[in-house]
Curated annotation (Swiss-Prot):
Organism taxonomic ancestry: Bacteria, Bacillati, Cyanobacteriota, Cyanophyceae, Synechococcales
Catalytic activity: nitrate + a quinol = a quinone + nitrite + H2O
Keywords assigned by UniProt, alphabetized: 4Fe-4S, Iron, Iron-sulfur, Metal-binding, Molybdenum, Nitrate assimilation, Oxidoreductase
Gene name in the database record: narB
PANTHER family: NADPH-FE(3+) OXIDOREDUCTASE SUBUNIT ALPHA, RESPIRATORY NITRATE REDUCTASE
Residue sites binding [4Fe-4S] cluster per the record: C14, C17, C21, C56
Organism: Synechocystis sp. (strain ATCC 27184 / PCC 6803 / Kazusa)
This protein's GO CC annotations: formate dehydrogenase complex
4Fe-4S Mo/W bis-MGD-type domain ranges (all copies): 7-70
EC number: 1.7.5.1
SUPFAM superfamilies: ADC-like, Formate dehydrogenase/DMSO reductase, domains 1-3
A Gene Ontology BP annotation from the UniProt entry: formate oxidation
Name used for this protein in its record: Nitrate reductase
Function according to Swiss-Prot or TrEMBL: Nitrate reductase is a key enzyme involved in the first step of nitrate assimilation in plants, fungi and bacteria.
């Protein structure tokens, strides 16, 4: 295990969102640096290029959650109705290995699954890929990034030939027009928003467009807020393209030299004249034309998007149709411009680079590509053909595998699917049928632990050393500066020990996380996400580094890689970017007389995911003491409801009960509910008991952002 450094101040990375803010953990002079969490104070790292010393309430209070309700020892029970028993690590590892061997004999390796998390460090991801996809020969490794970022991955891949956001945070401060769609950046990525908002306030010519059915803190400061109807994103984007083409506000030279399928794209957008678009989207002609003018007349345009676009059964198409506007106007590969997807979790980017979805391999490689498989097999020193050529199960498919008895072993790591998965009642029933479920986490109790047979205590941020990559492709070293409590271990060490016990000693002979990292970056060499020039030593000396960062680069070059595609050469076979030709299909579950409201959901400023950390922080609990349903006054009046009334919300799958907040911040016909409450925090406020699992056929990301509900007073 990596020992915590004995330093008065440790530069590290915030473990919450994908902004990747730099933090400084300052040890109390009265106490050892390896004492409990309250011996350290957190402040923003002014030298970190992504955050420049800024920190939000989550990062500022993170130490308050480090020692509350931690899982300290391995715990086991043979069935869900049995009490937990503390066991040794030796016994726990024996159980894991025995169960893997049993399932291999009964169901084959396709019956083995791991469902992990963007909370893991890149080293954790990498060792898990090697264990499952390499040594065990199953691609059934997926993560909660499937629920947040997989549509962005497939959008970039299909449009540009590779995943990877082409922009950087500096672009926030030099763009002439920022187009935000499907992102409440002020609440969900606050430090990014602070940088953009400062630029916007100081430069009157800069335009800020926000597309969101809610009037969020982000929308409140916009020059133009387009409160479109849920599900009409593609219609809006095609409508803007229609006007840009009509007004000749396009870059024909860029289109001719660097894109393909433009003529077919023109045929698509011809179906989206303004009168049709305004009716479907629920906006005025003036608003639509203003948006197109802002985009078309700006010297540089930067678009930002997140879960509001990705969490859709057309999530890939939505991302690609936004990219279309950049291709149409040549707004990519230059300062202040480009399509910028904002990652949700601190290492969702690093996970993608390490192959952390069931169709990927490390280094932005594809499972389906035989050359990619061969390259990975050679480095891993496993037999040719060991890596299965077919993608593994996605997150939802894993739980359905439990339901139909095709999955006999589910290893859940650093995530809480009994709160975060759609159609929760079905997920819970599937877990009740599981023959063996592991929950490897830093905290207990969690909602998912209620459905597990084995609990493995994990070291978390501050207790293990590793790297994470933020939304602007910047890799930061996150060193251990405290000792893990109890018998908690780093995730990668647990995976490696299981691998050794399965007979793969040579593949898992890592002495520390730096050794894992050295092997991992070899698989990124000469790939778009090249990190062969990144090492722990360079990160300690130079600070965070953006990729591509090649081994051959001089030190001065390592600090200058800001944007991708500056030469307009894309990663497709012919080097041209692809226009998306998809039409809008609306919502997967439209409203009807029985379910007349669209329920959307999202984050609150203070909370994070399912509250395993933030639910223990008093300041944040006071900010957000309970979940509330937002409803427009017109809808409330029709139902005879006023603020603070209790209502029942029902979908075709489940129900919840919440207090109402009557507000004009939400559009008529749409209601909003926060996503953070599981049954341990409120016994009747699970938003995902209402949502459905219909997913984008390309990214397999569920449409978590919209479902049809009815509402009645209680």
């Amino acid at each position: 295990m990596d020992s915590p450094a004995i330093l008065p101040t440790t530069r590290t990375l915030c473990p919450y969102c994908g902004v990747g803010c730099g933090l400084e953990a300052v040890a109390s002079p009265q106490k050892s640096v390896v004492d409990a969490g309250h011996a350290h104070k957190i402040r923003g790292d002014r030298q970190h290029p992504s955050s420049q010393g800024m920190v939000c309430v989550k990062g500022a209070t993170v130490m308050e959650s480090m020692d509350k309700q931690r899982l300290l020892y391995p715990m086991f029970r043979s069935s869900l109705d049995q009490p937990w028993q503390q066991i040794s690590w030796e016994a726990a590892l024996e159980i894991v290995v025995d169960k893997i061997q049993q399932v291999k004999q009964t169901l084959g390796v396709s019956g083995l699954c791991m469902y992990a998390s963007g909370q893991m460090q890149t080293e954790d991801y990498y060792v898990a890929q090697k264990l499952f996809k390499g040594c065990l020969g199953t691609n059934n490794f997926d993560t909660n990034s499937r629920l947040c970022m997989s549509s962005a991955v497939s959008a970039y891949s299909l449009s540009f030939g590779s995943d990877g956001p082409p922009c950087c945070y500096e672009d926030l401060e030099i763009t002439d027009c920022a187009f935000l769609i499907g992102t409440n950046t002020a609440d969900c990525h606050p430090i990014i928003f602070n940088r953009l908002r400062k630029h916007h306030k100081q430069n009157p010519h800069v335009k800020l467009i926000v597309v969101d059915p809610r009037c969020t803190a982000t929308a409140e400061v916009a020059d133009l807020h387009l409160a479109i109807n849920p599900g009409s994103d593609i219609t809006l984007l095609h409508g803007i393209a229609y006007l840009l083409k009509k007004w000749n506000l396009i870059d024909q030279k860029f289109i001719d030299n660097h894109t393909q399928d433009f003529e077919q794209y023109c045929q698509v957008i011809d179906h989206y004249p303004p009168e049709k678009v305004t009716q479907i989207c629920g906006i005025s002609l003036e608003q639509l034309e203003t948006a197109a003018h802002y985009w078309g007349n700006a010297k540089t345009v930067l678009s930002l998007w997140s879960m509001g676009m990705n969490q859709s059964f057309q999530g890939t198409a939505k991302g690609r149709c936004l990219i279309n506007l950049h291709l149409l106007t040549g707004q990519i590969g230059k300062p202040g411009s480009g399509p910028f997807s904002l990652t949700g979790q601190p290492n969702a980017m690093g996970g993608r680079e390490a192959g952390g979805l069931s169709h990927l391999l490390p280094g932005y490689r594809s499972i389906k590509n035989p050359q990619h498989r061969q390259e990975v097999e050679q480095l891993w020193q496993i037999s040719p053909g060991r890596i299965n050529p077919e993608p593994g199960l996605s997150a939802w498919e894993m739980f359905m595998g439990l339901e139909n008895q095709q999955v006999g072993f589910l290893w859940i790591v650093a995530t809480n699917p009994v709160v975060s998965m759609p159609d929760l009642e079905r997920v819970k029933k599937a877990l009740q049928q599981s023959t063996f479920t592991i929950h490897q986490d830093a905290y207990s109790p969690t909602e998912t632990a209620e459905y597990a047979h084995l609990l493995l205590p994990a070291a978390q941020w501050s207790e293990k050393t590793g790297t994470m990559t933020n939304s602007e492709r910047r890799v930061t070293l996150s060193p251990a500066f405290r000792s893990p409590p109890g018998e908690a271990r780093p995730d990668w060490e647990i995976f490696a020990e299981v691998g050794r016990r399965l007979g793969f000693e040579n593949q898992f002979n890592f002495v520390d996380s730096a050794a894992v990292h050295r092997e991992y970056v070899q698989l990124t060499a000469e790939r778009l996400c090249d990190q062969s020039g990144v090492s722990y030593e360079k990160l300690q000396k130079l600070g965070p580094l953006q990729w591509p960062c090649r081994q051959s680069d001089q030190e001065s070059q390592l600090l200058s890689t800001k944007r991708l595609y500056t030469d307009y050469k894309f990663c497709t076979e012919n080097g041209r970017a692809n226009f998306c030709l998809d039409h809008s299909r609306g919502l997967a579950e439209p409203v009807d007389p029985n379910y007349p409201f669209v329920l959307t959901n999202g984050r609150l400023y203070g909370h994070w995911h399912t509250q395993t950390r933030t639910g223990h922080i008093e300041k944040i609990k006071k900010m957000h003491p309970k979940p509330i349903l937002e409803m427009h006054p017109k809808d409330a009046e029709k139902l005879g409801i006023k603020s603070q009334d209790l209502v029942a919300i029902k979908s075709r799958r489940g129900s919840a009960q919440l207090e109402v907040l009557v507000t004009r911040a939400i559009a008529p016909g749409t209601v909003f509910m926060p996503m953070h409450w599981g049954f341990l925090w409120d016994d009747n406020a699970e938003v995902n008991s209402l949502t459905h699992a219909t997913a984008c056929p390309i990214s397999k990301q569920p449409e978590l952002k919209a479902c049809a509900v009815n509402i009645t007073p209680v």
